[in-house]
Amino acid sequence: MKKTKVIILGGGFGGVYTALRLDTTLARRADVEVTLVSSDNFLLFTPLLHEVASGDLNPSDIVNPIRRMLKRVQFVQADVRSIDLTAKRVHCTRGLRPVPLDLDYDHLVLALGSETNFFGMQGVAETAVTLKTLGDAAE
């Protein structure tokens, strides 16, 4: 029996909560395979990044390993390089010495997050303080 493959791209709130929902519904079915792909192996609770930056919380207080959160959804730590919509294939690389990994899908969820828009204002990207990652909070 051919399984229906669902791939979720992105390990932020959108991707992880989609995976959690599917973990309790579709992923229970024998004919469905759900996979979450993220470059990070943890969910970062970004609303508390300012607490890490101020020293009130440790970084470990606001991260949760994705693998521990999911029972039936497979997790793949990889970087998405491109998506072939015609072939229904996601091209990724994984590992320190990037190894190609191609994942076929029947249904694709895009939850890749966002990038800060500085609206073309000169010098802002280099001097602005952003809080989107643990690295930002450590600075």
List each language-model region with its residue ranges.
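FAD-binding core/adjacent interface of flavoenzyme oxidoreductases
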Residues: 1-3, 74-139
